[in-house]
Amino acid sequence: MFNRIMVPVDGSKGAVKALEKGVGLQQLTGAELYILCVFKHHSLLEASLSMVRPEQLDIPDDALKDYATEIAVQAKTRATELGVPADKVRAFVKGGRPSRTIVRFARKRECDLVVIGAQGTNGDKSLLLGSVAQRVAGSAHCPVLVV
């Protein structure tokens, strides 16, 4: 059924739920589990057009990447604690726009399913579906399960 399941993580409660669901599906299917954490790199153009908050510009990319790596490693550790064999789970960190990076990663790695949290770290609780989950669901080449 599924050979490669991808779970994007960002440290949010929604991502934890998605990881747990992804682990359950991995255990049912024996699929490989790919965990991806995307850190957002802010371009000079975005900065000059004031598309980002000033405090976001103060965080260097290395610090963002380190933080994303920590989140990805914690998610991988949690997946193995929940019973995924170590040789069946891999963690990745990429820089870029989250929705676009998730969709590209899923296509490049030939994922059969993306399991994503409905709300991420920037989630507005009043919204039914977060913008990243909505964009991924609308543009991924494979089925997307929103948890």
UniProtKB/Swiss-Prot annotation:
GO molecular function, one term: ATP binding
Keywords, in A-Z order: ATP-binding, Cytoplasm, Nucleotide-binding
Subcellular location(s) of the protein: Cytoplasm
One GO cellular component term: cytoplasm
Domain of life: Bacteria
Any single Pfam family the record assigns to this protein: Usp
SUPFAM superfamilies: Adenine nucleotide alpha hydrolases-like (SSF52402)
Keyword hit for Lyase: no
Induction entry: Cotranscribed along with teaABC.
Null allele phenotype: Deletion results in an enhanced uptake for ectoine by TeaABC.
InterPro entries, A to Z: Rossmann-like_a/b/a_fold (IPR014729), Universal_stress_UspA (IPR006015), UspA (IPR006016)
Quaternary structure annotation from Swiss-Prot or TrEMBL: Homodimer or homotetramer; in equilibrium. The dimer/tetramer ratio is ATP-dependent. ATP stabilizes dimer-dimer complexes, with one ATP molecule bound to each monomer.
PANTHER family membership: STRESS RESPONSE PROTEIN NHAX, UNIVERSAL STRESS PROTEIN UP12
Protein family: Belongs to the universal stress protein A family.
Protein name as annotated: TRAP-T-associated universal stress protein TeaD
UniProt organism field: Halomonas elongata (strain ATCC 33173 / DSM 2581 / NBRC 15536 / NCIMB 2198 / 1H9)
